[in-house]
């Protein structure tokens, strides 16, 4: 029977550093699933549409950077092995989203946000602190974050033209995955955050969306 490998604190820090590099360096994320955009037709968008869609996809890409950092921070400090594994699995799925968003941003002639390292560091710290408090709080933070992401995705789907089936296909699949992450976190015992906490999280999310839309 296969035995589970136990990592030392140094091993985990090195793994975290490797994940951070793969998250932040261009073209370094290798998705396990092909982009949903591949099978969708190319359409011609005007300059204004292209610029706006690129801005929305940049926001979504940074959101995935934050999610990746959040999961990694929580996995580092999670108390129960099964919670750590759940965080690591969710982080692997977020790599798909990262790669898909970056591919689409490049296709639109734009680039990911230069603020990604800042948001990665902040999110990693928040995730690590949540994990140190308790696994219940950590899982609750995942659920609240993913619900916020789903809200942003819904708003973006309303703004992206129906003819841009490539961008829409990516966001629609991301929404399915994010909702599943939120449900799984709550089913695993995650704490349901009260409205004031969720409101504070939404205010922080607005700072991210406003700043990364253009840069």
Swiss-Prot record:
Its cofactor is Fe cation. One of its GO terms (molecular function) is 3-demethoxyubiquinol 3-hydroxylase activity. Its main location: membrane. GO terms for biological process: ubiquinone biosynthetic process. It catalyses: a 5-methoxy-2-methyl-3-(all-trans-polyprenyl)benzene-1,4-diol + AH2 + O2 = a 3-demethylubiquinol + A + H2O. GO terms for cellular component: plasma membrane. Catalyzes the hydroxylation of 2-nonaprenyl-3-methyl-6-methoxy-1,4-benzoquinol during ubiquinone biosynthesis. This is 3-demethoxyubiquinol 3-hydroxylase.
């Amino acid at each position: 029977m296969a035995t589970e490998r136990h990592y030392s604190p140094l091993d985990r820090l090195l793994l975290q550093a490797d994940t951070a590099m793969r998250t932040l360096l261009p073209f370094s994320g290798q998705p396990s699933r092909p982009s949903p955009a591949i099978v969708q037709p190319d359409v011609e968008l005007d300059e204004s549409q292209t610029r706006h869609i690129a801005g929305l996809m940049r926001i979504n890409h940074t959101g995935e950077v934050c999610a990746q950092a959040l999961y990694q921070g929580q996995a580092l400090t999670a108390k129960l092995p099964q919670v750590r594994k759940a965080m690591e699995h969710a982080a692997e799925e977020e790599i798909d989203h990262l790669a898909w968003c970056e591919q689409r941003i490049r296709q639109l002639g734009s680039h990911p946000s230069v603020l990604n390292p800042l948001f990665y560091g902040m999110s990693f710290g928040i995730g690590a602190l949540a994990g140190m408090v308790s696994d219940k709080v950590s899982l609750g933070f995942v659920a609240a974050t993913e619900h916020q992401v789903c809200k942003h995705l819904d708003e973006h789907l309303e703004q992206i033209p129906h003819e841009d089936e490539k961008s829409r296909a990516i966001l629609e699949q991301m929404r399915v995955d994010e909702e599943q992450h939120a449900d799984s976190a709550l089913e695993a015992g995650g704490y349901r955050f009260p409205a004031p906490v969720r409101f504070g999280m939404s205010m922080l999310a607005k700072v991210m969306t406003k700043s990364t839309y253009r840069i």
